[in-house]
Amino acid sequence: MRQIDDKYYKRDFWVKENLDYARPHFRLEKAARIINRIARGKELDLLDVGCGPTMLMHFLHNKIHYHGIDIALHDSASNLIEMDFLEAPIKFGDKRFEIVVAQGVFEYVGSHQCQKFSEIRQLLKDGGTFISSYVNFHHVHKLIYAPYNNIQSFDEFQRSLSQFFHVTKVIPTSHRWNHEEPTSPFKKAVHMHMNINIPFFSSRFAVEYFFVASPRTPKKKESEFNPETALNT
């Protein structure tokens, strides 16, 4: 299961698309919860790749120094850089980070996936953490969003990621029948604290996954490297 399309969406598309993320939503809030638990109140630097309207920043602990890059920023600030990171390397000057997060990004990178993993690995400090979300395309009721140009199974995405990172945790965003994130306060509270896969059901009902990973030290060319996946659920 791998479908790659070389049609990439440019700034005009993302100016409108990012408006959908200008208010809090469940995946963002759960990402913030994961990040804050990893940070444990420590002072550190974070890069949000594909930050959109930077809503994540408002849910993070105040000791986390937020930086963001996006192809279509809605605001300008010293901690934000507008760039097309499919046309140019992912970076923020010469800065390196304790945490790099990419939500709703890798469904749109087409054939650039491995290159972007490599660039993110280089941005992390020793002991750093990369957090990436990815849609579960095996969901029983999943409809493929037309702009997606990088469609693959859970296993395919994890194998690719594991060439560059040790995957230490895989967390479902939620388990839902209709492939929509929970909206009621009760259901949000239940799924917000769900950090394990439900046996026999996760592959068909998990909406998305968060992959939490630490960088591998490159010893060979990426094309020759075939490590085992470290998965702790």
What residue spans do the PLM features occupy?
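Conserved N-terminal segment of class I S-adenosyl-L-methionine
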Residues: 1-95, 103, 117, 219-233
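Active-site micro-motifs of SAM-dependent methyltransferase domains
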Residues: 87, 106-108, 137-139
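A short SAM/SAH-binding and catalytic strip from SAM-dependent methyltransferases
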Residues: 99-112
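A short glycine-rich, Lys/Arg-flanked "PGG" loop and its adjoining helix->strand segment in the class I
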Residues: 114-126
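Conserved beta-strand signature within the Rossmann-like core of class I S-adenosyl-L-methionine
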Residues: 127-134
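A C-terminal cap/extension of S-adenosyl-L-methionine-dependent methyltransferases
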Residues: 131, 169-233
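Acceptor-substrate binding/catalytic loop of class I
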Residues: 140-156
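Substrate-binding/catalytic lobe of Class I Rossmann-like enzymes that use SAM or dcSAM, i.e.
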Residues: 145, 160-176
